[in-house]
């Protein structure tokens, strides 16, 4: 899903 991908990136840039 789109949200899933965005969420992953958000966690990758803490």
Swiss-Prot record:
Description of how the protein assembles with itself and partners: Heterodimer; disulfide-linked. The A chains have phospholipase A2 activity and the B chains show homology with the basic protease inhibitors.
Name of the protein this chain belongs to: Basic phospholipase A2 T2 A chain
GO CC terms: extracellular region
Domain of life, source organism: Eukaryota
Expression sites (tissue/organ): Expressed by the venom gland.
Taxonomic source organism: Bungarus candidus
Catalytic activity annotation: a 1,2-diacyl-sn-glycero-3-phosphocholine + H2O = a 1-acyl-sn-glycero-3-phosphocholine + a fatty acid + H(+)
Subcellular localization(s) per the UniProt record: Secreted
Keywords: Calcium, Disulfide bond, Hydrolase, Lipid degradation, Lipid metabolism, Neurotoxin, Presynaptic neurotoxin, Secreted, Toxin
Function: Snake venom phospholipase A2 (PLA2) that inhibits neuromuscular transmission by blocking acetylcholine release from the nerve termini and exhibits indirect hemolytic activity against human erythrocytes. PLA2 catalyzes the calcium-dependent hydrolysis of the 2-acyl groups in 3-sn-phosphoglycerides.
Family: Belongs to the phospholipase A2 family. Group I subfamily.
Cofactor(s) demanded: Ca(2+)
GO terms, biological process: lipid catabolic process
């Amino acid at each position: 899903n789109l949200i899933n991908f965005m969420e992953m990136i958000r966690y990758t840039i803490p």
